[in-house]
């Protein structure tokens, strides 16, 4: 069975953006992001890196009714170049970074889903690879994005999430040394960046317990 990896995450806290050596955006945003919410992203424009607020769930330029847009918050790397919703952004090299504190995923224990947060062991925020799009729907300008995902069936840490019978998927983390390159990459070069998370750099904990030891994020 095919499943999406990330439908809920905690974006980077504004008071921690300096940890990425970035300037703070001028807009506000929610501390817990779900599909169709607006969230911050980074993209390159005229050689500069800029912040934008974007809808979590990509809206293709051909969309006439926003109600048509469903399940576009994750883009599978295996099909991103051919899927109607994503192929324009991919072929036009519209790559972005989504700075986050935590990714939330279900872990099944005794047949029941328990939500866990995946975060860096050193407590630092990190940046997720995405594609972005610009569309005008019924006269409204919409900037949107999707997180790229890869298969992680054999990843010893990430394969514990989602239902046992489901394919295991993961977002892609772009490390600090490759962030600028990712924002200027071509779609032919992009697959070289889409690799699994380093096993020893991430851990997980139940979502309902995380505020006990990660209260510094939001």
Residue ranges and their predicted role:
Residues 1-218:
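Short linear sequence motif anchored by a di-proline
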């Amino acid at each position: 069975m095919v499943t999406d990896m990330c439908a809920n995450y905690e974006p980077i806290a504004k008071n921690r953006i300096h940890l990425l050596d970035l300037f703070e955006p001028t807009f506000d945003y929610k501390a817990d992001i779900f599909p169709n919410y607006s969230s911050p992203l980074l993209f390159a424009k005229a050689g500069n890196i800029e912040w934008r607020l974007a809808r979590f769930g990509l809206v293709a330029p051909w969309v006439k009714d926003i109600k048509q847009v469903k399940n576009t918050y994750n883009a599978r790397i295996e099909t991103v170049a051919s899927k109607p919703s994503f192929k324009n952004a991919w072929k036009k090299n519209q790559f972005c970074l989504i700075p986050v504190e935590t990714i939330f995923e279900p872990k099944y224990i005794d047949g029941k889903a328990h939500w866990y947060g995946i975060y860096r062991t050193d407590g630092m925020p990190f940046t997720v690879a995405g594609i972005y799009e610009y569309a005008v729907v019924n006269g409204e300008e919409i900037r949107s994005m999707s997180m790229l995902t890869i298969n992680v069936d054999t990843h010893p840490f990430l394969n514990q999430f989602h239902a046992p019978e489901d394919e295991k998927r993961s977002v892609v983390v772009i490390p600090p040394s490759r962030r600028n390159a990712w924002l200027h990459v071509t779609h032919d070069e992009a697959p070289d960046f889409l690799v699994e998370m380093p096993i020893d750099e991430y851990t997980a904990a139940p979502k309902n317990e995380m505020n006990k030891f990660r209260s510094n994020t939001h």
